[in-house]
A protein has these predicted regions:
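NAD(P)H-binding glycine-rich loop region in Rossmannoid oxidoreductase-like domains
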Residues: 1-32
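Conserved Rossmann-fold NAD(P)-dependent oxidoreductase catalytic core, especially the SDR/UDP-sugar
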Residues: 14, 38-81
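Active-site beta-alpha turn of Rossmann-fold NAD(P)-dependent dehydrogenases/reductases
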Residues: 16, 55-58, 79, 106-108, ...
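Hydrophobic positions on the long internal alpha-helix
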Residues: 36, 40-44, 92-93, 155, ...
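Flexible, glycine-rich beta-alpha linker
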Residues: 63-66, 80-81, 103-122, 143
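Active-site Tyr-X1-5-Lys
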Residues: 65-66, 77-103, 128-129
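C-terminal substrate-binding subdomain of Rossmann-fold SDR/epimerase-dehydratase oxidoreductases
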Residues: 129-216
Length: 216
């Protein structure tokens, strides 16, 4: 709170979170993603001059295993603690909507240079780069709306410029790609083959098998 008072931000982009779905500590997920966000909003609401916009990053994981192309009105059906924490964060943030200019975003899967190798795309790329013969993955029958982190950042920048309206926005490409497509693309780029093995330890119950957003 003291640091917020010193900085007096004009616009805020809140990305701090436990973002790895398979993070093993559920208590930490909720403490960081929900309580941590509430602490930030409380500090911002205490400022004499409000920021013009406070952008809060939720996640498309809140939709769960919904079918079809998903817009912001699609019902929420979170399938893991990470997704539940993001849904709870959204509900908590609504309590501050009359005091702060909020913008909620639900980004679909995105990746880029520097992302940790525990995430899917960097893990696959790293295995091909090292010339590995085998890669162990969890559920392979999945498809996602993959996005470039630079496009996500540009979307956030545009939404920040609009001012906080209390609205929720999907950040997505509107295109869905299977895990098998990603593997085949890397085979083509690298000129290498790799054996894909399913490691039961990586298989998650209630896996979200398909996510595609409506960016219209």
């Amino acid at each position: 709170k003291q640091r917020i008072a010193e900085v007096r931000p004009q616009r805020v982009v809140h990305l701090a979170a436990i973002s790895f779905v398979a993070h093993g500590d559920a208590d930490e997920i909720y403490r960081v993603n929900v309580v941590g966000t509430r602490n930030l909003l409380e500090a911002l609401a205490s400022l004499e001059q409000m920021p013009a916009n406070v952008l809060l990053a939720s996640s498309a994981n809140v939709y769960g295993n919904a079918s079809g192309v998903l817009d912001e009105q699609a019902p929420l059906s979170p399938q893991n603690d990470y997704a539940v924490s993001k849904m709870a964060m959204e509900a908590m943030a609504a309590l501050w909507a009359d005091r702060l200019p909020l913008t909620l975003v639900r980004p679909f899967n995105y990746t880029g240079v520097g992302q940790d190798e525990k995430f899917l795309i960097p893990k696959i790329v790293a295995h091909f780069r090292r010339g590995a013969d085998v890669i162990e993955l969890g559920n392979t029958d999945v498809s996602c709306d993959f996005n470039d982190v630079r496009g996500v950042a540009a979307a956030y920048e545009g939404l920040l410029a609009m001012g906080g309206s209390g609205q929720t926005y999907n950040v997505c490409s509107g295109q869905e790609h299977s895990l098998q497509e990603v593997i085949e693309r890397m085979r083509g780029i690298s000129g290498r083959d790799i054996e894909v093995k399913v490691n039961p330890a990586f298989v998650r119950a209630n896996e979200v098998k398909s996510l595609r957003g409506d960016n219209g």
